[in-house]
A protein has these predicted regions:
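ATP-binding N-lobe of GHMP and related small-molecule kinases
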Residues: 2-101, 119, 123-125, 314-330
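Alpha/beta catalytic cores of group-transfer enzymes, especially the acyltransferase/condensing modules
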Residues: 125-174, 240, 260, 266, ...
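Active-site rim beta-loop-alpha module in soluble metabolic enzymes
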Residues: 180-240
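Short beta-strand segments
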Residues: 18-20, 36, 94, 147-150, ...
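Solvent-exposed alpha-helices and their adjacent loops that cap or buttress functional pockets
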Residues: 7-11, 25, 34-37, 83-85, ...
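DPxDG-like acidic metal-binding loop motif
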Residues: 39, 103-126, 148-150
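Glycine-rich, charge-dense phosphate/pyrophosphate-binding loop(s)
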Residues: 217-330
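Short beta-strand-to-loop capping motifs
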Residues: 47, 157, 181, 271-275
């Protein structure tokens, strides 16, 4: 008589995630849109007997602690809600996203935790549910949608944990410069300065500019961006908290700078450079963009303002399109 062999539980394979930074609001598209750009939170996870983390890059003292870690907290909470035990993990984190500076660091961390829970907990979650859960935890869907899907994300909440999302691949080249001040700005503080009511004129202007902004990205119309970035709903009220913004907005339409907006609620500022800018010898391409970036650096020095300037660009690949995640879904 043959005896049945017990099936061994299949070990869950390691997972690697690459989550881009995101910039929400983009001037007039307040609480409605976000853009993914090329700074990344990279997470490698392997099943283990106990939790441990190694971290490199920006803010390793925050990214490398196990206690109160946003990725691990989210991971545990999602699995607990699903009635599953949290498999201990060894994480290696490589972080390039400024933390607490309006660049979507919390959305990236929460999405990482959710993705780890889905993978190691063997949850059958769709992209929509992953983005919805991250949006519920973030209290708005723009950063989460752009981080997971890439490109330009237009999003709204349609329930407590349901997000309606449309993603657009911007046409053409969109070089960016990110100005990051030394001090962080809590989102709660940036929210407190906003008015409770707006005039019809201001609301209409923002709707018009949001439509122009969308058209600029869809059609690759850089010429529309200078006027399309005007906002009347949040940036005028936050300018006192983010002195980089009014200084950099003065460059809009000149010196190869298309415009500047708060990244999220600030204090970082996202600067759109003209991909067709020319250098002093009439050369375009990288030379022209580099000259525009140098103009920004010189302007900040002349204004007596200090900030780290990071050259980057829009990225159309979100965490949900990464090789490791795509492989596990195939």
């Amino acid at each position: 008589m043959k005896t049945r062999k017990k099936k061994r539980a299949l070990a869950v394979s390691p997972l690697a995630l690459v989550l881009p930074a995101t910039s929400a609001n983009l001037g007039p598209a307040f609480d409605a849109a976000a853009l993914a750009f090329g700074l990344f939170l990279k997470v490698q996870a392997v099943a283990a007997n106990e939790f441990s983390i190694t971290a490199s890059g920006r803010d390793p003292e925050i990214c490398g602690r196990v206690e109160n870690h946003l990725i691990l907290t989210t991971y545990r909470e999602v699995l607990q809600a699903e009635g599953k035990a949290a498999q201990p993990l060894v994480l290696h984190i490589e972080n390039d996203i400024p933390i607490g500076k309006g660049c979507g660091s919390s959305a990236a961390a929460r999405l990482a935790g959710i993705a780890l829970a889905v993978h190691f907990g063997r949850l059958r979650w769709t992209d929509s549910r992953i983005v919805g859960e991250a949006s519920r935890r973030e209290h708005h869907p723009d950063n989460a949608a752009a981080c997971w899907m890439g490109g330009l994300a237009v999003a709204r909440m349609s329930g407590e944990s349901e997000a309606q999302v449309a993603c657009i691949i911007p046409k053409g080249k969109w070089p960016l410069l990110l100005a990051v001040p030394e001090e962080a700005l809590p989102t709660e503080q940036a929210r407190r300065v906003l008015p409770k009511e707006y005039s019809r004129a201001d609301a209409v202007t923002n709707v018009q500019n949001s439509m122009l902004l969308l058209a600029a990205f869809v059609q690759g119309r850089r010429d529309l961006l200078v006027s399309a970035l005007e906002d009347r709903m949040h940036q005028p009220y936050r300018a006192a908290l983010c002195p980089l913004l009014p200084a950099l907005q003065k460059l809009a339409g000149a010196s190869g700078v298309l415009g500047a907006v708060l990244s999220g609620a600030g204090p970082s500022v996202l600067i759109f450079l003209d991909a067709n800018a020319k250098d002093g010898n009439g050369k375009g391409g990288k030379a022209g963009v580099d000259r525009a970036a140098a103009k920004v650096r010189g302007h900040l020095r002349a204004c007596g303002l200090r900030a780290e300037l990071i050259s980057t660009a829009i990225t159309n690949r979100g965490a949900g399109q990464g090789k490791s995640w795509a492989k596990r879904r195939s």
